[in-house]
């Protein structure tokens, strides 16, 4: 063989060595993950066939992701309970669901709920259990957001966000948990946010409430694992909903604007389908976001100094933009 021919063969040989090394290193990890993924898909299909007739309670069901979740679970044949403050909007969602061609179809139940009124939640759960005597799947989706920096946010606003986003879901979960434990089955799904994984400027109150939700879900999951109760925590990125439009300012007034990031966010319908799969597969914790948010998540944990530097730059940029707009 000529020298030139040997040179031509060298890269191929090098690549073969590289592939062998990567295969040797990654195969022990990749193979079990692939098997787990196949098993989860099999289980998801199995449990999807068991969904018809399941009782699903969805908070924040009057619009946005909650409304999309109502459609997804209703089409799956579930007995859906719609909960939120705005009864008129819940009735609209119910009417839309009844117009769908679904078999089997159970008429949705509308029950008004204000997560900020913690003392009313035990009575709300009594009404829920009076309808179907059980809840198979609880989806803690209701919540509000804030658009303001720490210095300009009133403590009352911090408190309101924490009560609605965290304590409301905690109170509802605690009120329903005994019935799930007694039956020996149930699934509790917390709709958190990527901001429950890492914090960004001008979202302190919102991010704090989602961090608290994440911690609560993780603790609860461990405590009920031996009781046949599953706990999932879903952390989405930006979603095309009215979350920013309905957000609060630091003083507690209405923000009243749709952020560019929200407008370009993922479809709530697609996210609702992914959440259904999460519950069917009994996935404990998932992040559903674009690549940028996932990079931020890994930076926060693997290279925190760089993450903090990026966030500091972002804070200055947001502050300057706010000054120009006023």
Swiss-Prot record:
Which residues are exposed on the Cytoplasmic face of the membrane?
1-17
Topological domains annotated Peroxisomal: 39-326
Record: active site:
206 (proton acceptor)
Q: Which residues cross the membrane?
A: 18-38
GO function term, MF aspect, one: all-trans-retinol dehydrogenase (NAD+) activity
First-listed, main subcellular location of the protein, grouped into a coarse class: membrane
Q: Where in the cell is it found?
A: Peroxisome membrane
Q: Which Pfam families would you find in this protein's record?
A: adh_short
The yes or no answer to whether the keyword Transferase is present is no
Write out the GO cellular component annotations. Answer: membrane; peroxisomal membrane
- SMART domains tied to this protein: PKS_KR
Q: Which residues bind substrate?
A: 193
Q: Which UniProt keywords apply?
A: Membrane, NAD, NADP, Oxidoreductase, Peroxisome, Signal-anchor, Transmembrane, Transmembrane helix
Which residues are noted in the entry as NAD(+)-binding?
A: 57-81
Q: Membrane topology type, per the record?
A: Single-pass type II membrane protein
Q: Keyword check for rRNA-binding, yes or no.
A: no
Q: What is its EC number?
A: 1.1.-.-
Q: Which family does this protein fall into?
A: Belongs to the short-chain dehydrogenases/reductases (SDR) family.
What is this protein for, i.e. what is its function?
Answer: Putative oxidoreductase.
Return the NCBIfam families for the record.
PRK06181.1
Q: What name does this protein carry?
A: Dehydrogenase/reductase SDR family protein 7-like
């Amino acid at each position: 063989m000529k020298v030139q021919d040997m040179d031509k063969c060298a890269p191929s040989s090098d690549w073969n060595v590289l592939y062998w090394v990567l295969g040797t290193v990654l195969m022990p990890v990749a193979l079990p993950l692939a098997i787990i993924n196949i098993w989860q898909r099999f289980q998801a299909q199995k449990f999807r066939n068991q969904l018809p007739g399941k009782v699903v309670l969805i908070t924040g069901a009057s619009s946005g992701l909650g409304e999309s979740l109502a459609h997804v679970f209703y089409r799956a044949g579930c007995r859906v309970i719609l909960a939120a403050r705005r009864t008129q909007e819940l009735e609209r969602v119910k009417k839309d669901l009844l117009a769908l061609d679904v078999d089997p179809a159970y008429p949705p139940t509308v029950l008004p709920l204000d997560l900020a009124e913690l003392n009313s939640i035990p009575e709300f759960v009594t009404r829920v259990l009076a309808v179907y005597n059980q809840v198979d799947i609880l989806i803690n989706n209701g919540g509000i957001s804030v658009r303001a920096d720490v210095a300009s946010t009133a403590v009352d606003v911090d408190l309101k966000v924490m009560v609605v986003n965290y304590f409301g879901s905690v109170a509802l979960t605690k009120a329903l948990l005994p019935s799930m434990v007694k039956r020996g089955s149930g699934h509790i799904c917390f709709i958190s946010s990527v901001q429950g994984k890492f914090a960004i400027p001008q979202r302190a109150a919102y991010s704090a409430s989602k961090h608290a939700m994440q911690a609560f879900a993780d603790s609860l999951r461990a405590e009920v694992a031996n009781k046949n109760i599953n706990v999932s925590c879903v952390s989405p990125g930006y979603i095309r909903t009215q979350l920013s439009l309905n957000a609060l300012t630091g003083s507690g007034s209405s923000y009243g604007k749709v952020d560019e990031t929200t407008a370009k966010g993922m479809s709530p319908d697609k996210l609702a389908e992914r959440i259904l799969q999460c519950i069917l597969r009994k996935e404990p914790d998932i992040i559903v976001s674009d690549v940028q948010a996932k990079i931020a998540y890994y930076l926060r944990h693997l290279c925190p100094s760089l993450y903090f530097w990026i966030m500091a730059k972002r804070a200055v940029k947001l502050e300057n933009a706010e000054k120009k707009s006023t």
